[in-house]
Curated annotation (Swiss-Prot):
It comes from Thermobifida fusca (strain YX). This is Small ribosomal subunit protein uS14. GO terms for molecular function: rRNA binding; structural constituent of ribosome; zinc ion binding. The keyword RNA-binding applies. Coiled coil: none annotated. Its cofactor is Zn(2+). Disulfide bonds: none annotated. GO terms for biological process: translation.
Length: 61
């Protein structure tokens, strides 16, 4: 329940712009969020492995 409240709080426009922070659009995790995809590193990895993110390939060098 607390996580849902924090997600709702993050969606609201803050009084000051600096207070805004990114959250994963899938699970609500506040840390390690890729801005381009709006996903945290864990969700990004899972979705990339399943092929749900077009254009994302596993790096190999």
């Amino acid at each position: 329940m607390a996580k849902k409240a924090l997600i709702a709080k993050a969606n609201r426009k803050p009084k000051f712009r600096v207070r805004a922070y990114t959250r994963c659009s899938r699970c609500g995790r506040p840390r390690a969020v890729f801005r381009k995809f709006g996903l945290c590193r864990i969700c990004f990895r899972e979705m990339a492995h399943r092929g749900e993110l077009p254009g994302v390939t596993k790096a190999s060098w």
